[in-house]
């Protein structure tokens, strides 16, 4: 075979290898990403939009403006929704049904020193991407029954919010989001996952599953089980092979799993990876 032909053949093999779907622990393949999102240097929470098909919601971590970003699955920012509130340590965003239809819940629950007397959860009607803003948020001041905790993960089912602490126990706390102008709601401990440092949790778009992530795995639970305190997962996906700079967010829509990461020194843009997974029914 001529040298030129060998070079062409080798180049074609290399290109095919580079463009191949990347397998993640068997059940998942990367179908897009990592996409680089310059406005999300500290992408923290992630949620699948219920009102805008094909879009995700995310936000930056502490020290940033109170803005929700609508992204498509390639990482392009399609909308920016500012909220008229002050941020302390935003850690998560969740999408769920509410009395007015579909709502977004922002969890200002970060507490690295476990010293905050109260944390805050904000609820707003989920806007259409064409809307420049949404209604003023409802504010839920909250405490834990056993004192302050650092947490980065929250999911919402009906009128109840569930917070998972960022410690070895990964304890789950539950409270009903009842507005009150004069007193805080109290989160009660209902169980623990024992996963270590949980950075995000979210219900699937159809509401049947809850996905919880750490730096090295995404763990799936049946929603009906988890809200009753049954903490046995039905599926686990290893994700540490993706080499995210600092993996943070997770969202699930059918068989699509989405992961977000903060940027790294020298390239501050956040990352978004989309995976297609073969999940048990």
Whereabouts are the PLM-identified features?
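N-terminal Sec-pathway targeting helices
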Residues: 1-7
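Sequence/structural signature of beta-propeller domains
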Residues: 3, 13-281
């Amino acid at each position: 075979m001529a040298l030129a032909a060998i070079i062409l053949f080798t180049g074609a093999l290399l290109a095919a290898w580079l463009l191949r779907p990347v397998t993640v622990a068997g059940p998942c393949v990367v179908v897009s990403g990592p996409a680089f999102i310059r406005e999300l240097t500290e992408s923290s929470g992630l949620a699948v939009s219920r009102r805008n098909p094909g879009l995700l919601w995310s936000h930056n971590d502490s020290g940033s403006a109170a803005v929700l970003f609508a992204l498509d699955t390639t990482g392009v920012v399609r909308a920016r929704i500012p909220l008229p509130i002050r941020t302390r340590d935003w850690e998560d965003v969740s999408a769920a049904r509410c009395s007015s239809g579909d709502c977004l819940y922002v969890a200002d629950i970060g507490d690295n020193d476990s010293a905050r007397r109260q944390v805050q959860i904000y609820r707003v009607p989920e806007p259409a991407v064409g809307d420049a803003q949404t209604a003023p948020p409802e504010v839920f001041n909250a405490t834990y029954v056993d004192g302050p905790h650092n947490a980065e993960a929250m999911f919402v089912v009906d009128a109840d919010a569930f917070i998972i602490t960022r410690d070895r126990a990964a304890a789950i706390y539950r409270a009903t989001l009842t507005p009150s102008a004069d007193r805080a709601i109290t989160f009660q401990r209902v169980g623990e996952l024992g996963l270590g440092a949980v950075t995000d949790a979210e219900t699937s778009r159809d509401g049947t599953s809850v996905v919880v992530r750490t730096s090295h795995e995404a763990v799936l639970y049946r929603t009906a089980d988890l809200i009753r305190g049954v903490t046995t997962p039905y599926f686990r996906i290893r994700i540490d092979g993706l080499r995210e700079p600092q993996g943070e967010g997770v969202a699930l829509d059918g068989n699509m799993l989405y992961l977000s990461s903060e940027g790294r020194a020298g390239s501050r843009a956040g990352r978004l990876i989309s995976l297609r997974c073969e999940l048990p029914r």
